[in-house]
Each structure stands twice: as C-alpha cells, then as structure tokens.
Amino acid sequence: MDLPEELLPLSWLLGQWVGVGTGQYPTIEDFRFGQELSFTCDGRPFIAMNSRSWILDDEGNRVRPSAMESAFFRPRPDNQFEALFAHPTGFTEVWYGRVTIADIQDARITRASLEMTTDSVMRTESAKEYIGGQRLYGLVSDGDLAWTFDMSAMGEPLSNHLAAKLQPA
C-alpha cells in the first residue's frame, strides 16, 4: 500500500519499535520502563500510534503494566502535524508540531525529528491533574527512535518525565 504523499515527512516513524526508557518527576520515585510502540498507516491520510509500557526491575524484567496510549497524527501544511492522543487514565490531548528532516540517504530519511506541544487537554473528573506537555521524537544516526516527554502536572512546572531509546522490532 502506498503512503499518502502528505505523510511522507513522518514515514520514518512507521513500524514497530521496542526498547527501554527512564521516568522521573518531582512527585514520584525514578523508574525504568520497557516499551513497545507501533506507528501504522492503512492508506488514509493519518498515522495511527499505539504504545504500551511496563515498569522494569533492576534486571530488566517486567514488574507490572505502566502506561498505554493511542494517537492519530494528521498532516497540516509545511511539514506541520496535529495529533490526537487518548489515555486510559482519563485524559485526551490535542498536540501541534513540526517535522524537521535532517538527512536523507538513498531516497530514505535517515535523521529527523518531530517536536510537539499540547494545545489542549481534556480530562475526566477522576483523572489526575495534568496541564500540558512537550514531546520530541527523533530518528537518530544509528537508526533508533529516541523520544522525550516533558509535562506540567500535579502543581509542578514543565519538567522532564519520560525518555526512551527504541530499536526497530
């Protein structure tokens, strides 16, 4: 199936990714997590993302489920994108961002980044306070996917919460 032309700037995200990351925030203890992340396109002009993660012990074994999220990335003009994220913990987000292509070799994107900022957050009555965040996804020179998530939540200012480096599955 051909990828719609307007999604080509995000084509480097497509596929299955697995790896390990770290988490921290002023209101919790630091932790390590394992993650499975997939980006897919069924031919329509959006990319679907599904992520699930687990808390890991010191030996790298799964201790318990950690987080899940689903998202849809939709193109806008000039390498800009909007994304809709949903979380089972009771909130949804609208994100806006821009893709930067840093290197192309043999007609393939080999280094790129997607920077995004929340535009709005909607949460259920029972969800924890979460104001907004920033995300950065990057295809780094070794072909891995690195990403970070900074958030403002539970009365704390914007600060790093998650970072991971994932390899193609």
Describe the function of each predicted region.
Residues 19, 48-51, 80-85, 114-118, ...:
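Short hydrophobic/aromatic-rich beta-strand segments that constitute the beta-sheet cores
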Residues 123-153:
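Surface-exposed, gly/pro-biased binding rims or lids
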Residues 34-40, 69-74, 94-103, 132-139, ...:
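Hydrophobic/aromatic beta-strand elements that line small-molecule binding cavities or substrate pockets
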